[in-house]
């Protein structure tokens, strides 16, 4: 069986944790930040986890 190719777009956006979960960065922190509160911008800096429904698909895209 041939080796699986890594989806390069997914590799840039997601990282696997040691426990097998998938981390992602949060959206809405790129531009138009003047109308957003400091607290909201601070929470966008925190990393989130991919939902359980999407995790198997992402794991297939980043096998290594």
UniProtKB/Swiss-Prot annotation:
Keywords: Ribonucleoprotein, Ribosomal protein. InterPro entries: Ribosomal_bL35, Ribosomal_bL35-like, Ribosomal_bL35_CS, Ribosomal_bL35_sf. One of its GO terms (molecular function) is structural constituent of ribosome. It holds the Pfam family Ribosomal_L35p. GO terms for biological process: translation. GO terms for cellular component: cytosolic large ribosomal subunit. Residues 1-25 are annotated as: Disordered. PANTHER family: 54S RIBOSOMAL PROTEIN BL35M (PTHR33343), LARGE RIBOSOMAL SUBUNIT PROTEIN BL35M (PTHR33343:SF1). HAMAP family: Ribosomal_bL35. Belongs to the bacterial ribosomal protein bL35 family. NCBIfam families: rpmI_bact (TIGR00001). This is Large ribosomal subunit protein bL35. It comes from Koribacter versatilis (strain Ellin345). The gene is rpmI.
């Amino acid at each position: 069986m041939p080796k699986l190719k890594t989806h390069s777009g997914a590799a840039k956006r997601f990282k696997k944790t040691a426990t097998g979960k998938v981390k992602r960065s949060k959206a809405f922190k790129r531009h138009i930040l003047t109308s957003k509160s400091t607290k909201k911008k601070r929470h966008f800096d925190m990393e989130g986890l991919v939902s359980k429904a999407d995790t198997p698909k992402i794991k297939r895209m980043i096998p290594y």
